[in-house]
């Protein structure tokens, strides 16, 4: 139940930051699906408005309940998420060569998005109860590794390498934060470096092509490299101040693929230029800094680790998505938080921000 005393500690700054980024996202999405596009395409924008309304409700719930209840129910949430990931492999909606979505009446959801929150909670639960100032050994890291790898492999099977890789980055960020024994860290780094080249042999052909065209888009300029080339043209053509709202030609002439999801940053960069791009990046950096300050000010380990996990989720999504659009990273289908179209992504981010607010408010409460 919501404690009314917490209202005096409500984090209005965090809410304002998230609202501004979300507002920029809606304006950019409107442009992406409106400029010289057929009327049916505009329904994407109206769907996103509905998802934002649902996200507002989800955020309200997530900051209203005591986040410490997640410590108690974390395992149940995790198991439920694993069951959903198994279910989607057999009964999920098959789109574009992957099976990632569960159909729930008129809407579809991605359990892999919810898996990010579930893994954060169980890792925060484990590390908060197994504090180790000298650093965790390989033996102590075995259980959190298993908790991470189970959903990881289920997501890889869909296949969705972008979300699976993001899950590893979030888990890795949390684990580095709680500290790893030096010898164990060196062993993990060497082992990881040895395993990475072997991953190539397990990739599907289209995944290999994405990596190759990331290294040289001109290898397939009309195929796998087309996305990156057109995205870089859009970003570069925006120059300093951009072409103006609804004036982006790459988007309007349908040169830019996936303009409302993976490459929405390219739409923003073309219309608002370098200045608009920097403003959005600075807003994200401020949001990340805000999350880390909340983690630093928390008085107990579970809340601290949870805040670090949520902040790392936002950080890595921003890095990967913007990196994709600029040709600095392979195209792996990771959305830009609160900007890209996608109900599951918006809900997950809203829940995460709500939990950050939760930790922020309750850190001031006297024990």
Question: Predicted regions span which residues?
Answer:
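Hydrophobic alpha-helical transmembrane segments of multi-pass inner membrane proteins, especially
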Residues: 15-31, 35-227, 266-326, 351-355
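Positively charged n-region of N-terminal signal peptides that target proteins for export
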Residues: 2-4, 72, 183, 367
